[in-house]
UniProtKB/Swiss-Prot annotation:
Disulfide bonds: C98-C194
Location of the protein in the cell: Cytoplasm
Protein name listed in UniProt: tRNA-specific 2-thiouridylase MnmA 1
Residues at the catalytic site: C98 (nucleophile), C194 (cysteine persulfide intermediate)
Biological role stated in the UniProt entry: Catalyzes the 2-thiolation of uridine at the wobble position (U34) of tRNA, leading to the formation of s(2)U34.
Amino acid sequence: MSKGTVALAMSGGVDSSVSAYILKERGYDVIGIYMDLWRDEREEYCNKSAAEDARRVAEKLDIPFHVINIEKKFKDNVIDYFIDEYLSGRTPNPCVACNRTIKFEAFFNAAKEFGADFMATGHYCKIEERNGRKVIVKAEDDKKDQTYMMYNLKQYQLERTIMPCGEYKKDYIREIAENIGLDVYNKKDSQEICFIPDNDHGGFIKRNYKSKVSEGNFVDKKGNIIGKHKGIIYYTIGQRKGLGIALGKPAYVIDINPITNEVVIGDEEDIFRTELIARDVNFIPFDKLEKSMELEAKVRYSAKPSKATIIPLENNKVKVVFQNKQRAITKGQSVVFYDKDMLVGGGIIEEIV
């Protein structure tokens, strides 16, 4: 007897491909869906290749396969946001934006239109029930854990979402793929932003919005001009390489001012801070933070969680006070909170205090 119908987001990669197999083995009826998100002349072949990989896997596993076009929604909510953030002197997190608006909104709604009871992805996270609520827990494979990008999810989404890969190590996922004859078993993991395969975000922005990128001044902490920069989109807090200025000592980006089009340069000690304000905060184990909590938090995907106090503010904001100084806290990035293995929530870094 079927456990229900699952619409699986298939990317053509090994994780979503093996997810299809696992779900079938568990007794679900699986529908494979590839999302056509973005293309230009440089990326079109890559998109076709990924879609064909997904289609071949679906045929091999004998599951229905569909391609849906979400280009406009992706452009409006991810591409435009990505570019606007860089032009505003912030460093965006497109994967967080994509999860919130595309994978767990647009795809979630598409799954319902296909008559699915659940949706599934190849993300490395676990969904459990604790104290009567669905929560997100760190993946079995700590090196592949993707909970940092999931803090925006709501209860209604978690109740209908399955993430099979979260329960396994990545090596085992590849082993399954090879054993069942999937030719994507050795396909490389994507390391870059999906719509910028060459990882040159500055070039991408300049190709699409050339008129908005202009040179400006490097200034020191006192406002003295110390050089010329090629456009604020090319810089982020804590950056040392590629500045193109020689000061006789290591120089770091410590602030970006989009109004004056200036990049502020300082010393390494200037990029270590302990406090920030985050906006658009979402919590998963509860609806609202009523009082301060002692948790762990991290300010980038690759960082280790560090002890911090999370203090509720008005307008869906929080203040985060770390016990130890954090390197290069960056406006536009996400700060994410944990209680041991459980994802508690997160928000967008708005201000560094």
